[in-house]
């Protein structure tokens, strides 16, 4: 489906962008464009891959003109650019709005103007019942995506999205932090032992985006069914795997804007979601404001549903957590006694 096509990845120097490159650079894709702000990361990536299919565009999703220029001649877009650190977005909420909301508006408008065939927007479980600025901005991003998809010709451009949880060992995530603390002999800093999070590998994240790309219609949102684990289970598993089962753990309390558990689908979304095996598809609500022509009687299904969250999904024990961790190249390197860097 990518033969001879051009793909642009916004925020492409991050963990997701690197995972996509590893998957696609050796295929028959014509070109992959990396669009991001950081020229140093782009230069590092250029040297690392040294591939003529890889093109680099310096720019910011906040700047419509730079997005418009970069997307000219592109067939597909994976929109991954985002501010995603919860505490920093709490202190700078308008920066989250500028990147996650207005930046998405710019990417989608540029895609429509340039006749891009398909766009997949990457969202997060924090957009469901959001209590923090990052989650609120991502929830608004999803609303922008659905609103844009209502008014676009599906024969020209398809806009859909994905929503996923914690991507294990990605840059800025907790697993590399715990590994560093174990190596340095520092107590593991746990916010709340009972806090649960969905667990996904980077490969899972790429698979989810490709599934949405292949199956999505305008306004669709896709979610992968994923296991979850408590932060304590993750910490205990890591200390055991690194030969330090008695390593101390320090409970430091939740950070700004953190939740005890995350949800991937709200109760309302579960009522209309389509079960597609390993994934859920959430279709857009395409009603207009004249509700009387759509609904004559109240919908009882919603009151019977339960949201899909990290407390009620499959719960990993330490053995299950270990099996999942060993899928990561980051942890495989550690097990071999080699230097490991976060998943890229």
Q: How would you describe each model-predicted region?
A:
Residues 6-27:
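N-terminal Rossmann NAD(P)H-binding glycine-rich loop of SDR-like oxidoreductase domains
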Residues 10, 71-80, 121:
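Rossmann-fold scaffold of SDR-type NAD(P)-dependent oxidoreductases
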Residues 28-41:
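Conserved glycine-rich Rossmann-like NAD(P)H-binding loop of the short-chain dehydrogenase/reductase
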Residues 36, 58, 98, 192, ...:
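Conserved residues in the N-terminal Rossmann fold of short-chain dehydrogenase/reductase
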Residues 55-76:
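Conserved Rossmann-fold cofactor-binding substructure of NAD(P)-dependent oxidoreductases
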Residues 56, 96, 159-162:
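Hydrophobic/aromatic anchor residues within beta-strands of the central parallel beta-sheet
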Residues 79, 83-139, 143, 147:
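Conserved Rossmann-fold NAD(P)-dependent oxidoreductase catalytic core, especially the SDR/UDP-sugar
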Residues 107, 113, 143, 147-344:
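Strand-loop microenvironment adjacent to phosphate/nucleotide-handling motifs in alpha/beta enzyme folds
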